[in-house]
Amino acid sequence: IADINEGDFVLDVCAAPGGKTFHAADRLKGAGKVLSRDLTEYKTELIEENKDRMHYENVEVQQWDALEEDESLLESVDVLLADLPCSGLGIMGRKNDIKYQMTEEQLGELAALQRQILSVVWKYVKPGGQMIFSTCTLNKGENAENIKWIEENTPLHLVSIEEYLPQNLKNRTAWNSRTPPRTNAAFSAAGSPAASPPTS
């Protein structure tokens, strides 16, 4: 759903194991760059292994805490991919233990962590750029409520992703859409900087 074009600078802030990074790199067709970051050495090594195995020249991998602001990236990114840590409730079909281990308190902590990351990374999006916020959960607190938070606390505004969706998902809001039985569920939203910051 990201509007990635040749020559773009793409930042993937929570990237491991790298699937979105490499899809973005393919979309660039060799004319642009993907900066692929994650928190731990283990995760960045996973991305590096996949990068080397698939021979991507336009991907740079860095170990970086998404909660730490990188001033060198402010307003420089064409497309920001923010597939953030979440409860994973949309993939219980293949990770059945999630429903037995996840608590209400943990759900709240994950939603708060997402907001903390979003409060840092949205600043990297250049005017006219795009941020994709996504999770693999259907928890309203991690999805719809965080979209509301973005709109109230940043100059980003929602943009339509309908043209990228299959017909059966068009004209529906992401947080109340049902997916077919025995499939995984996910949430995605796209935002671009508004002409001026919101007023309080």
Regions found by a protein language model. Give the residues of each.
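S-adenosylmethionine
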Residues: 1-200
